[in-house]
UniProtKB/Swiss-Prot annotation:
Listed pathway(s): Cofactor biosynthesis; NAD(+) biosynthesis; NAD(+) from deamido-NAD(+) (ammonia route): step 1/1
Record's function text: Catalyzes the ATP-dependent amidation of deamido-NAD to form NAD. Uses ammonia as a nitrogen source.
Reactions catalysed according to its record: deamido-NAD(+) + NH4(+) + ATP = AMP + diphosphate + NAD(+) + H(+)
NCBIfam families: nadE, PRK00768.1
Subunit comment: Homodimer.
Name of protein: NH(3)-dependent NAD(+) synthetase
GO-annotated cellular components: cytoplasm
Amino acid sequence: MQAVQQEIAQALKVQPPFANAAALEAEVARRVAFIKDCLANARLKTLVLGISGGVDSLTAALLAQRAINELRAETGDKAYTFIAVRLPYQVQHDEHDAQACLDVIKADEVHTVDIAPAVRALAAEVAALKNGSPTLVDFVVGNVKARTRMVAQYTIAGARAGLVIGTDHAAEAVMGFFTKFGDGACDLAPLSGLVKNQVRAIARSFGAPESLVEKVPTADLEDLEPGKPDEASHGVTYAQIDAFLHGQPVDQAAFDIIVATYRKTQHKRELPFAP
């Protein structure tokens, strides 16, 4: 492991690879306990999470629903609730995957909020967007979509006295691959410190089908490139990112991209600048 790999892995609190099935189950139990502790410390009984159709939100939701199920069983209090939220922009091209995720999760409640009217209304009122290039406008509005989704989740959480769950993990965090104050905003991040293959392994341990576990990851925020794979945006694969974070050798081109992107996106992983 090179020094910079160790530095980044420590900063992101990257967890070691699962040695075996028992280690995986122990990590699942630890993260479920973490979610339960967050609710106890906040003195709240509701969790809210947006479901995209990807493996990250699927895995976070499976952990959340298990935590809620355990709390109800332990306390006898039926008020403990997990709310899964669908947040499409009009009609989502992979809606069938989102519905398949919901079938696996079996959430206590499922809500749907179409973010398109809010996103379009805001974009129409921002004069700075009117003269931008199509590519720039598409990128900026893509971030508006992510932030609007989080506004919707916090609106539900506020109405139901709940906490909002985020889906950030180490393989996304190192690349700064989230919208600042969008999907990067949450009350708790139960996947933090995991690399992508560990997120997939946890989903698989819950019995999620391979079609969802191995689905090509996409943020799907840009209308001009719908369904654009994350890896096309990164310039490296998740396998390379995972290997880097676990101190394994990666080719020099991938190494340089990961380090440069980590440094360029440092502001996204920090609190606002203050004097």
